[in-house]
């Protein structure tokens, strides 16, 4: 057990503790017919994806990182009666499962072991899974293989539903409805699990409220150190969400400056960390085709009745970020090296979505040969993990990890 306090104080400082989520039932329920609705482009060979994900966790453990797993944490959390009641009160509501099925479903779930309940909440629940006759209108409408609770395959990407920013955490209101239950379940872990209960400071936002157009996802959030936070605004994170998060951070003195980076709204660039990540010191890897077109909004605490002071900075993003971090310039390693075809291919395969374990040491998919070679040429150690199956989810090692303890640099 680590003795360090919860908090993420940089992008590349020594990683002490991280949460990941293994592939499982939710991914076995992905089909060519439903994968788009569930925000996947393809289906996994789940057996291989599980083995590759185990290798991901084992590699971090070998490097001294304490690796926690979402399903296990949730199962342990649900053994706590107060936590189980809180989760089921909000997950098994008439709005979600209909008036006719709610009581039977709740009575059954109240008696399940925590681990099994966690499996259904993450993996999804069909009419055929329940031990009672689902004779309600909702049950009849769904049919035997219809989802009472849809699966949450994107929980694999633990980065997104919460963001640790310096000494606190945001519980993120996610863009797509298919992902929003992830935030509720993660909030339960933070509020009730013995490893987190009483030690977590929630900065923003309440997972039980409707936040309207204010959306935020962790792949867009980078606490880079010294009170500076970079945030992407693209497909998943809105200006409204960035403004509210910045206001909350400034109000508590947890950040002094937020640079919001405007991105194109595209699947290939859904988050900031799909086009730009830090590797150590001033070295970054980036898909320059997108990054070179991004512009920045510089946010500081406002004065008087003005909640935020905002300036639109039209300089290139790399110049803005370098200056804000105190560097003369950033050493930008292009995704895919110098070949434009490989640049496009390797960006699609998360070539620049790397996770720093400490300054100069990152994890990335083995399939991105040119990106990894270019990083090594700049002195970065790349620990490769198998990406043939996991890469089908369109998320790399940074996407698949939620750091909860990371040192400053």
Swiss-Prot record:
Give the pathway: Amino-acid degradation; L-arginine degradation via ADI pathway; carbamoyl phosphate from L-arginine: step 1/2
- In Gene Ontology terms, what is a biological process of this protein? arginine catabolic process to ornithine
Principal cellular location given in the protein's record: cytoplasm
Record-linked SUPFAM superfamilies: Pentein
* GO MF, one example: arginine deiminase activity
Q: EC?
A: 3.5.3.6
Residues at the active site: 399 (amidino-cysteine intermediate)
The entry's localization annotation reads:
Cytoplasm
Among HAMAP family, the record links this protein to: Arg_deiminase
Protein name (record): Arginine deiminase
- Recorded name of the encoding gene: arcA
């Amino acid at each position: 057990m680590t003795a360090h306090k919860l908090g993420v104080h940089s992008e590349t400082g020594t990683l002490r503790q991280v949460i990941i989520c293994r592939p499982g039932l939710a991914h076995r329920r992905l089909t060519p017919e439903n994968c788009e609705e569930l925000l996947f482009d393809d289906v996994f060979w789940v057996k291989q994806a599980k083995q590759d994900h185990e290798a991901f966790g084992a590699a971090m453990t070998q490097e001294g990182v304490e690796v926690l797993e979402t399903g296990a944490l949730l199962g342990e959390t649900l053994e706590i009666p107060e936590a189980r009641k809180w989760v089921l009160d909000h997950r098994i509501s008439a709005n979600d499962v209909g008036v006719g099925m709610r009581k039977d479903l709740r009575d059954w779930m109240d008696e399940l072991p925590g681990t099994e309940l966690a499996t259904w909440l993450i993996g999804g629940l069909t009419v055929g899974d329940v031990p009672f006759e689902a004779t309600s209108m909702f049950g009849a409408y769904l049919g035997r293989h219809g989802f009472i609770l849809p699966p949450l395959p994107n929980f694999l990407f633990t980065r997104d539903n919460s963001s640790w920013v310096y000494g606190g955490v945001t519980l993120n209101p996610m863009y797509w409805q298919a992902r929003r239950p992830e935030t509720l379940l993660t909030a339960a872990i933070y509020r009730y699990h013995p490893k987190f209960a009483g030690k977590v400071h929630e900065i923003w936002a309440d997972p039980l409220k409707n936040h309207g157009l204010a959306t935020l996802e962790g792949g867009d959030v980078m606490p880079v150190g010294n009170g500076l936070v970079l945030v992407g605004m693209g497909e998943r994170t809105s200006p409204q969400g960035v403004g509210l998060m910045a206001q909350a951070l400034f109000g508590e003195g947890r950040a002094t400056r937020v640079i919001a980076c405007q991105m194109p709204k595209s699947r290939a660039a859904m988050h900031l960390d799909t086009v730009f990540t830090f590797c150590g010191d001033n070295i970054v890897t980036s898909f320059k085709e997108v990054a070179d077109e991004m512009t920045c909004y510089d946010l500081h605490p406002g004065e008087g009745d003005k909640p935020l002071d905002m300036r639109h900075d039209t300089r290139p993003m790399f110049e803005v970020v370098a200056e804000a971090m105190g560097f003369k310039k950033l050493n930008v390693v292009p995704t895919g090296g110098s070949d434009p075809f490989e640049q496009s291919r390797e960006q699609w395969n998360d070539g620049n979505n790397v996770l720093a374990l400490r300054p100069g040491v990152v994890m990335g998919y083995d399939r991105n040969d040119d990106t990894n070679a270019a990083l090594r040429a700049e002195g970065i150690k790349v620990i490769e993990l198998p990406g043939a199956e996991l890469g089908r989810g369109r998320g790399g090692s940074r996407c698949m990890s939620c750091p909860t303890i990371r040192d400053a640099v």
